[in-house]
Amino acid sequence: MAWVVDTCLLIDLAIDDPKFFPASARLLDGKQADGLAVCPVSVVELAPVFAGQLTAVEEFLERLNISWPEVWTLADTQAAFAAWDKYIARKRQGSVAKRPIADVLIGAFAMRFQGLLTRNSSDFRQLFPSLPILEP
């Protein structure tokens, strides 16, 4: 079963980030045999990196051998619904993530895969405690 690649790792590779590229590339290379997938939300988040050119995003994902498009399912919606409810409860207590809705949707999507590859594990762990998460 494939691992879902978070947007941050894709950006590291797309912009050849001097700080994060090497570790992000090693992590993706190490999980290539399991398969790699991307959430539709991450594809949307990549738009500014590729000047709004969806074909450029698709070519980039193809070069990385990352499965796209993946379908958003009812199970994804149910997981996102529950996680958003948790997020709002945390917000009312004063502890919130930076980009809550994107992280909720990406984490929910990753629940039906092997896990999530990200360098922002703290953004996901409280909302998705059973989600396997690997960092570079």
Residue ranges and their predicted role:
Residues 54-57, 87-88, 133-136:
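Short, hinge-like loop/turn segments at secondary-structure boundaries
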Residues 1-38, 48-61:
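Short, well-structured N-terminal submotif of metal-dependent ribonuclease cores
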Residues 69-115:
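Active-site neighborhoods of divalent-metal-dependent phosphate/nucleic-acid chemistry enzymes
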